[in-house]
Curated annotation (Swiss-Prot):
The keyword Cytoplasm applies. It is an enzyme of class 2 (transferase). It is found in: Cytoplasm. NCBIfam families: PRK01305.1-4, PRK01305.2-3. Functions in the N-end rule pathway of protein degradation where it conjugates Leu from its aminoacyl-tRNA to the N-termini of proteins containing an N-terminal aspartate or glutamate. This is Aspartate/glutamate leucyltransferase. Pfam families: ATE_C, ATE_N. It comes from Mesorhizobium japonicum (strain LMG 29417 / CECT 9101 / MAFF 303099). The gene is bpt. GO terms for molecular function: arginyl-tRNA--protein transferase activity; leucyl-tRNA--protein transferase activity. It comes from the Bacteria. GO terms for cellular component: cytoplasm. One of its GO terms (biological process) is ubiquitin-dependent protein catabolic process via the N-end rule pathway. InterPro entries: Acyl_CoA_acyltransferase, Asp_Glu_LeuTrfase, N-end_Aminoacyl_Trfase, N-end_Aminoacyl_Trfase_C, N-end_Aminoacyl_Trfase_N. Belongs to the R-transferase family. Bpt subfamily.
Amino acid sequence: MTQHPTQSPQFFLTAPSPCPYLDGQFERKVFTHLVGDKASEMNDLLTQGGFRRSQNIAYRPACETCRACVSVRILAQEFTASRNMKRVLQHNSDLVGAMHNAEPSTEQYSLFRSYLDARHRRGGMSDMTVLDYAMMVEDTHVDTKVIEYRRRGPDTFITGKGQGELIAVALTDKMADGLSMVYSYFNPEFEERSLGTFMILDHIARARAMGLPHVYLGYWVNGSRKMNYKMRFMPQEHLGPKGWERYTNEAVSR
């Protein structure tokens, strides 16, 4: 029997595994492959529907008894930085981010390795090799960019690039309606710089400059302390049963 390729994506369901965010819970994911000349268009649609990308896979939670994972996107054009965020921007005013094609480097992997060893030694990515990292960056069929952050140099105004050591990196998908932050990491020795916050603020500024309405942050998990930082970037929308809806929480500390 002859089989013909189909343009419609095929979806698969993973087996249950321990949830990395909530103790005692088990997670399942539904996923599909992002390949071919329609990969970018499909990634846009799936991201708007609550999926995340990892290499050439788009996935979203499909847990049987839990709905704690909520897709979050910042309304970039309406965003106003808080006083604390303005201090973060000022503290990092000596840094500049240069956007490159999705190409890995040994310098990136060295920084990535230092970040994991300091912050996520027991995480699911802790045993990634240099080849694993290269696949994470370059195994993409969508418009993926790597943003490298370094200190400003005398030629930065002309070149748009920094100089010296690599301080932080963001792996980002450029979509029709926004920027999706796939993964980011930084030099753990510069914890006082709040580089995670800085990179999100930088993505908001980039989205605004590009005329894009959203910055996608992935999932917020109510009850997970490691996810609380996402609630600081207001206004934002959450994806629920009725679609994307504006979220407000007066208790969020700004």
